[in-house]
From Swiss-Prot:
Key words, A-Z: Cytoplasm, Hydrolase, Nucleotide metabolism
Residue positions of the active site: 71 (proton acceptor)
PANTHER family the record matches: BIFUNCTIONAL DTTP/UTP PYROPHOSPHATASE/METHYLTRANSFERASE PROTEIN-RELATED (PTHR43213), BIFUNCTIONAL DTTP_UTP PYROPHOSPHATASE_METHYLTRANSFERASE PROTEIN-RELATED (PTHR43213:SF5)
Protein name: Nucleoside triphosphate pyrophosphatase
EC nos: 3.6.1.9
Length: 201
């Protein structure tokens, strides 16, 4: 049995993670208004945003289907970082991040339209950043890659060169925790293999 799986996100990295493990999602980016969420608690922020994204898309769908919403931020030194506002912002952030340890938080909301049930979880991974030089920081920012990433780096891209160590879930840093997703699917009463597409990853 193949269950329709909907990803309420425009993130190419999240879609690729799912495709790598055999899940070919229907991608329906959410137009949830993130500005209405004002909490300064990083865990509450990512779970609230993930839920908002998933619910907007779920309300437009018919059962049976599973809808996944995700949101990620980097917490470092008590500050919350989403996507940078531009190259200079990325440079400024990396000057703060270099040589430091941050926490990458990803909120996951999985909605089962058939059972009218949803699960909300947060995965946290610690990331040690390398002590980059000013030239390395500017060169990386000017590639444009960090401008599209929560936390200002892409672990699965050039940014992977500037991460010294990860403690916790690797895929969580890229955009969603595959082990956590499997657990959530199981908790809803499904087998993750029910989501596999007929095509090879």
């Amino acid at each position: 049995m193949t269950i329709p799986f909907i990803l309420a996100s425009a993130s190419p990295a999240r879609r690729q993670l799912l495709k790598t493990v055999g899940i070919d999602p229907v991608v329906l980016p959410s137009h949830f208004d993130e500005s209405q969420v004002t909490t300064t608690d990083p865990e509450a922020l990512v779970t609230t945003l993930a839920t908002g994204k998933a619910e907007v898309v779920a309300h437009q769908q018919q059962p049976p289907a599973l809808v996944l919403g995700c949101d990620s931020v980097l917490e470092l030194g008590g500050e919350i970082y989403g996507k940078p506002q531009g190259i200079e912002d990325a440079i400024s952030r990396w000057k703060t991040m270099r040589g430091q340890t941050g926490r990458l938080l990803t909120g996951h909301t999985l909605i089962d339209l058939k059972q009218n049930h949803q699960l909300i979880r947060c995965q946290i991974t610690e990331v040690d950043f390398a002590p980059l030089t000013d030239n390395q920081i500017r060169a990386y920012a000017e590639t444009g890659e960090p401008l599209h990433c929560a936390g200002c780096f892409a672990l699965d891209g050039r940014g992977g060169l500037f991460v010294e160590q990860i403690r916790g879930c690797h895929s969580n840093v890229i955009g969603l925790s595959l082990p956590l997703l499997r657990q959530m699917i199981t908790e809803l009463g499904y087998d993750v293999t029910d989501l596999w597409s007929n095509e090879s990853p």
